[in-house]
Amino acid sequence: MHKSLIKSQSAIVDEKDNLIKAFGNVSVKSNDGKKLLTDSLLWDNSSDKIFTEATLEFITSDTDTFYGKGFESNIDLTNWNILNPRGSINNE
């Protein structure tokens, strides 16, 4: 079973729309080692999707790190898309 842990400096829970808005040093860590770092994040609890329009760093392994602006994924970071990517992959 895939799981993720979200941490931030602050968050707003919108129970009506079933959303969580996280702000300030947001990190999402999946149990398989992926890590998303950004300044703001929206979690749609209805669809278990996360989104950000902010700049981000996404670490998929010890050697692969992607950077970009704009990100969407399922909550466990197994199906993700960086909207404006740039990156570094080490083939060692």
Language model features with spans:
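Mature-chain termini and adjacent capping regions
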Residues: 1-92
